[in-house]
Amino acid sequence: MSDVNPPSDTPIPFSSSSTHSSHIPPWTFSCYPGSPCENGVMLYMRNVSHEELQRFKQLLLTELSTGTMPITWDQVETASWAEVVHLLIERFPGRRAWDVTSNIFAIMNCDKMCVVVRREINAILPTLEPEDLNVGETQVNLEEGESGKIRRYKSNVMEKFFPIWDITTWPGNQRDFFYQGVHRHEEYLPCLLLPKRPQGRQPKTVAIQGAPGIGKTILAKKVMFEWARNKFYAHKRWCAFYFHCQEVNQTTDQSFSELIEQKWPGSQDLVSKIMSKPDQLLLLLDGFEELTSTLIDRLEDLSEDWRQKLPGSVLLSSLLSKTMLPEATLLIMIRFTSWQTCKPLLKCPSLVTLPGFNTMEKIKYFQMYFGHTEEGDQVLSFAMENTILFSMCRVPVVCWMVCSGLKQQMERGNNLTQSCPNATSVFVRYISSLFPTRAENFSRKIHQAQLEGLCHLAADSMWHRKWVLGKEDLEEAKLDQTGVTAFLGMSILRRIAGEEDHYVFTLVTFQEFFAALFYVLCFPQRLKNFHVLSHVNIQRLIASPRGSKSYLSHMGLFLFGFLNEACASAVEQSFQCKVSFGNKRKLLKVIPLLHKCDPPSPGSGVPQLFYCLHEIREEAFVSQALNDYHKVVLRIGNNKEVQVSAFCLKRCQYLHEVELTVTLNFMNVWKLSSSSHPGSEAPESNGLHRWWQDLCSVFATNDKLEVLTMTNSVLGPPFLKALAAALRHPQCKLQKLLLRRVNSTMLNQDLIGVLTGNQHLRYLEIQHVEVESKAVKLLCRVLRSPRCRLQCLRLEDCLATPRIWTDLGNNLQGNGHLKTLILRKNSLENCGAYYLSVAQLERLSIENCNLTQLTCESLASCLRQSKMLTHLSLAENALKDEGAKHIWNALPHLRCPLQRLVLRKCDLTFNCCQDMISALCKNKTLKSLDLSFNSLKDDGVILLCEALKNPDCTLQILELENCLFTSICCQAMASMLRKNQHLRHLDLSKNAIGVYGILTLCEAFSSQKKREEVIFCIPAWTRITSFSPTPHPPDFTGKSDCLSQINP
């Protein structure tokens, strides 16, 4: 489902001349998830120009000339940068590969590259694989006749695998089909065996995974073709063999050597020679989804003998697990759905994910299919407007199906918007076109029965994750041989080669389509006229497991698509059947229940339900389905997710809070799309901006939406401007804006200007952001404005200079509305006093901000002058006893009504307690004190208890979590509990007071019969209450951050 299109991966060449770039751009070291470069070593080599790489290889040959198995220029002349890295790691194990690389760059006068090489080796040296001084440099010694056989084998491989795709199978037998390669897959080819971090080891097993039809088999055949041309890792001198799993999994037992001999008839001696050097074997295994037997995962059942005749499942499992031929290199082509089956057998596999067509390749395919015509432009614009449909086109064969289906509609003169109201309807139009000529010989009743049987077969197999369908499956679905023959003729089903009674759906898309159709078919003559979806199966269809897409996601899309009334009408017309909306009513009952029981987890992307609702496209249905959505967490990474999110958010009537993570660089997409439509605005970029505006409009139209959190996000100027405009809209009722780990460029005039443009905004949080001077000046300006109604400002872990913090503190004075300021994990050092001087503040938190005992005197002085402060937290600063003494001395002389003081984790000891108890007895306003995580120990707590006995001490809440005291002080504490009439909450958790201490305190506690609302926390007993579970007063809530729970 995902269709993220990252920027081009084109290498940036460098030169060794004086004009060489001053640095290697950081992005050139990164790789997209699932790329063969991910976690690769020496990635900087891909930035080497062609001329420089050729020079590097010439110098490398000189280094290799002393080996027992020298490399020739013919073997490296066409080698890619990744193959050169592979050769380096292979011939120079451990750090020697980096030393040789650095030396060669030094000879080439590439000083900057030498620095980069040294930086990498220093980073990975601790985890690097130890040097093997006995590197095996052996090869198979072949006689002339044997070399000739290998040459003939390579010739046969080139003939067999060119063209790369098979024109005799679906959809190659369709006249308008044409093949277009996926450029990124071509780039992946030479990188498949790139050595990986952290050990710098060359992968011996590579699992190439991807969606059905994405191009795994084509890539495998491309590897074989390039190997036969000596263009794929030529320095390895491999013998490569491609096996479909059905070749291995025969009904009769066979040995692996016999499998090889089938490729080389009459070459038994040659096979034995090759098998004696298994490190020179390259084995490609494909077709796991068509296996009709189960893989074996019990090691004791496997075999290491390649001469032994074995059942197919044992032979295949022995190869996958490296029990047999552990030195051989394996390339495995596998679907996502087969990964869990194979994963337990594989040892240290390197995972490569094939992404399919990117946006540019999809556009190119449409343009090549339709030509550069007005009709082609209309179809392309229509497809790009439907982002779900366009994202499905990343699979090449699906892209062709969509083009073919839309072309049929254009040829009939149909309006695409009306005839194809959603993505599902495009597939309805195409797939139904396979039926008429072959179905017309059936009576209507037979046609209905055969269609039901096909749908039943598809549904059962989808629920059971079954791709190969046997005789029993056909019988269960009541699909007779006549129907099977008909569907084989339509290319909807395909018989597995060598398996007389086993079939697969020709395309998984067909299987998903007919499985969903099963639940909308109507049978008026029956008592129950439709097949009911169970509660569990509905949950499976709309689930988003761990943030990824379920293998049932397309089936779920098709189901909801069929339930769109216009699409349902197209189904009835195209398939000559009736449609039931019975499951539509059930969906409306089940969806709210699922959301209540299992709400989406943070970071899980866009919920699968949102895609399904976008596909049904019916206002009333969508609004009712989203009735219980009060908070939505979305991770948006592509244009499809923007469009779908906008559609659904606008229909969440009771939405209160939105959390957005925007991981797509909108500006890159804008430029990329525009470059494909020179002279005009690209449909995708135009649509993307429109959909983003649509999403932002939710803040202006939903008067219940009060909270927006932006996390890990980057927004280009046009998109940030659109968001800010929506937040400034007069109808926007947003009260809280939280910016966490966003790009610093987002703190610009547009977004900060929202503080004066929105009169409802009361809370602003900026967290984990580099705050630049320009942003602070803007913030200071709006904070001084009388139109700024902000009441609470939270700045956490913000990278800024001391001057910036000083300027901010000085500029807060002019804001009469700001009552709460939370500063956490910021390097304030000597700037803390500026914030205590802000006259209008009632609540101030300066936590973990590098305050020290040296700053406490100025802090205490400012505290004395404050008139409004009720809550102060200086938690997680190393104030020590000497610094805290200034705070204690200030408490009796305060002009402000301070009620809560938090000195949690401030490096205090029992030495500060004498000053503390004096202050507590003299200050009449302080009600709550948090001293947790300080080393008060028994002596300090005993002194504190003496103060609490004093009737002048009005403290109601005392928190002493993890203060390192024991049962020794419990007698004094019990005595205090008997006499103190004010204390309502006492936290003693994480202290080793033992059973004796607990019993002593419980006795004192239970003796206070008149005290009905005392709560205290002690070790082992989470909470003990006397008659009432009433929590401590809400005014004094909180642990380390006494202000974190404040609502605007």
Curated annotation (Swiss-Prot):
Transmembrane segments: none annotated. GO terms for biological process: regulation of inflammatory response. Residues 204-527 form the NACHT domain. InterPro entries: DAPIN (IPR004020), DEATH-like_dom_sf (IPR011029), Leu-rich_rpt (IPR001611), LRR_dom_sf (IPR032675), NACHT_NTPase (IPR007111), NLRP_HD2 (IPR041267), NLRP_innate_immun_reg (IPR050637), NOD1/2_WH (IPR041075). Its main location: cytoplasm. Residues 1-23, 1029-1048 are annotated as: Disordered. GO terms for cellular component: cytoplasm. It is found in: Cytoplasm. Residues 33-131 form the Pyrin domain. LRR repeats lie at residues 815-838, 839-861, 866-890, 923-950, 980-1007. SMART domains: LRR_RI, PYRIN. GO terms for molecular function: ATP binding. It comes from the Eukaryota. Involved in inflammation. Belongs to the NLRP family. This is NACHT, LRR and PYD domains-containing protein 8. It comes from Homo sapiens (Human). The lineage of its organism: Eukaryota, Metazoa, Chordata, Craniata, Vertebrata. The gene is NLRP8.
